């Protein structure tokens, strides 16, 4: 009898969570779908807006967590961003499908999804460029062709060429020495970026994101930093050249995780291009300045890759189900990669959490920092590392850590306040009574000359 009840409840839950239909969703449809998922899974989701587009459309995010709206210490934050280019729409539809899938599988008690939601705070932004999407969708309905129609925002700006250029600073510092992380924004950055870009920058500064992927279209490849080439310009264009980050091996692994879990990306030959293993260094493919994935790596703790997911930027509705089946496992596996490396708390001797402590790994010239709650996350490949935590006013602490291939290693730091060194005693010349310095006696020049002559030996007659 209990088995029949269990089957009935399973079917009831499956029926209540109606799947997202495989069709393109305009802005109003997208908003309805996000709130539909939230209504179906209210205890593990939250819908929030990070700002508005040029045309006033909200940039909505759907959050999945067992405590929506709350950062739990030692629980990593991960994000997906879709539709940055308005006419590259597959990512938008995949993220809607993923949202419904996470909700449905959580309610069906799929233990893999339950564990993912309970141990991770997931943020899904289906569309960063809703204005551009509406232009592209309207053109499709009118059968207007154009490779770039709807790509940019309503001001005609490519949002993936609109972030502050921090690569110049890191390339200089790699050669001459200097900071290797969290490069500051220019003083006038807000006047140089679009509303959508500004909203995303403020968003990623507000959350301690650890891992991210930016979903695009027009090719099928997993692209990892750096995007901007270190090479010299040739005829006004920056020369294509492999430009790795200090975390190059880790980024390659993250890209391969997606590529090999994808239905066909790993095969390499797609859309007339060949990429070994279905991955590429961004600058090795083509150099791109002011891109979002480099900005994430250089300004925050977040490791982001760019996923090019379809040859056709605006695939037909009939192709969406196949694309979803080809990407579903890869989307889940990539989220799970946030649980690797090391993580822990940084505290002082009184167990107060220390924010902005710097976590350095020997041999990797890129540091991360602890968040507002004192927790830090450092993605690493399996191996043995020397890890140091530092904070102003505290003695550094260094430990040796062996990282395995599965769960992240918990490494806490408890920093001791630096003991101020006693200043060496200084000899004070001409010390007089009560510590006063007595001035030297000053003689007139003539008197000094006469005194000198008198001290010289007198010569007798020859």
From Swiss-Prot:
Its main location: secreted. Keywords: Carboxypeptidase, Disulfide bond, Glycoprotein, Hydrolase, Metal-binding, Metalloprotease, Protease, Secreted, Signal, Zinc. The keyword Secreted applies. Disulfide bonds join 41-103, 271-311. Binds 1 zinc ion per subunit. GO terms for biological process: peptide metabolic process; protein processing. Zn(2+) binds at residues 85, 88, 216. Transmembrane segments: none annotated. Belongs to the peptidase M14 family. Protects the body from potent vasoactive and inflammatory peptides containing C-terminal Arg or Lys (such as kinins or anaphylatoxins) which are released into the circulation. Tetramer of two catalytic chains and two glycosylated inactive chains. PANTHER family: CARBOXYPEPTIDASE N CATALYTIC CHAIN, PROTEASE M14 CARBOXYPEPTIDASE. This is Carboxypeptidase N catalytic chain. The gene is CPN1.
């Amino acid at each position: 009898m209990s088995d029949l009840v269990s089957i009935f409840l399973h079917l009831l839950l499956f029926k209540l969570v109606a799947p997202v239909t495989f069709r393109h969703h305009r802005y109003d449809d997208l908003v309805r779908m996000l709130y539909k998922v939230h209504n179906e899974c209210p205890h593990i989701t939250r819908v929030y807006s990070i700002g508005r587009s040029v045309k006033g459309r909200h940039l909505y995010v759907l959050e999945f967590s067992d405590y929506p709206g709350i950062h739990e210490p030692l629980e990593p934050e991960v994000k997906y961003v879709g539709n940055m280019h308005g006419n590259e729409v597959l990512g938008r539809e995949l993220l809607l499908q993923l949202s419904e899938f996470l909700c449905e599988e959580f309610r069906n008690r799929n233990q893999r999804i339950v564990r993912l939601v309970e141990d991770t705070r997931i943020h899904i932004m289906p569309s960063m460029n809703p204005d551009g999407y509406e232009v592209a969708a309207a053109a499709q309905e009118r059968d207007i062709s154009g490779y770039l129609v709807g790509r940019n925002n309503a001001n005609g700006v490519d949002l993936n060429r609109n972030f502050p250029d921090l690569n110049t600073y890191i390339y200089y510092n790699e050669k001459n020495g200097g900071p290797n992380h969290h490069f500051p924004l220019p003083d006038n950055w807000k006047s140089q970026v679009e509303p959508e870009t500004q909203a995303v920058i403020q968003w990623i500064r507000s959350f301690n994101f650890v891992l991210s992927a930016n979903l695009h279209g027009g090719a099928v490849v997993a692209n990892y930093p750096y995007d901007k080439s270190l090479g010299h310009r040739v005829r006004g264009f920056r020369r294509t050249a492999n430009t790795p980050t200090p975390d190059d091996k880790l980024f390659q692994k993250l890209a391969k995780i997606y590529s090999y879990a994808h239905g066909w990306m790993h095969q390499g030959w797609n859309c007339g291009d060949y990429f070994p293993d279905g991955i590429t260094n961004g600058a090795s493919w083509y150099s791109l300045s002011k891109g979002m994935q480099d900005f994430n790596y250089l300004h925050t703790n977040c490791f982001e890759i760019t996923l090019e997911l379809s040859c056709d930027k605006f695939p037909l509705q009939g192709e969406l189900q196949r694309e979803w089946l080809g990407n579903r496992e890869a989307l889940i596996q990539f989220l799970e990669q946030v649980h690797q490396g090391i993580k822990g708390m940084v505290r002082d001797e009184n167990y107060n959490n220390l924010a902005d402590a710097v976590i350095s790994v020997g041999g990797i010239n890129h540091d991360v920092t602890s968040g507002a709650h004192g927790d830090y996350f450092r993605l690493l490949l399996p191996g043995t590392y020397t890890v140091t935590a530092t904070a102003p006013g505290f003695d550094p602490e260094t430990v040796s850590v062996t990282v395995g291939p599965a769960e992240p290693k918990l490494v806490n730091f408890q920093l001791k306040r630096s003991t101020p060194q006693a200043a060496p005693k200084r000899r004070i010349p001409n010390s007089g009574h009560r510590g006063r310095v007595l001035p030297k006696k000053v003689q007139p020049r003539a008197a000094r000359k006469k005194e000198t002559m008198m001290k010289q030996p007198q010569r007798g007659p020859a």
